[in-house]
Amino acid sequence: MPWGFFQSHFPYTIFYMKNDCPCGSAMPKFILTVEGCLRIGMVHLHSELVMPGDEPIGGGFFDVDYISNRLILYRQSHDYGVPRWHLVETLRVPKDYRGYTIKYIYDDGWHEDYNVSDSLPIEYYDDKDNN
């Protein structure tokens, strides 16, 4: 299949050809925990983002739009499924993303995009604290 097919059908997906990824095979992934903690990182597996005591309730991939200050979350984790936003009361986001609008894109043909920033109160945490 031509490369343009993937770019047009999967606009929010980052595809790397073999040996092109700057981090080996790590990808930009996130998980959501039942405590409302959004964990973000360049990892091989979503499970690498889980800290002791965490209970993941979904995950997926992310992209950062630096021009419009948006954190775009999309797709789903094979390990933890689609993020279950309805179980979260307050979202805790790494402080590096303060001021960013957060949006989750379902892209399944059934759900509308979920504007996380407008739907949940957001607190920020220092990523070094690991909580």
Describe the role of every protein-language-model region:
Residues 1-131:
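Eukaryotic phosphoinositide-binding membrane-targeting regions
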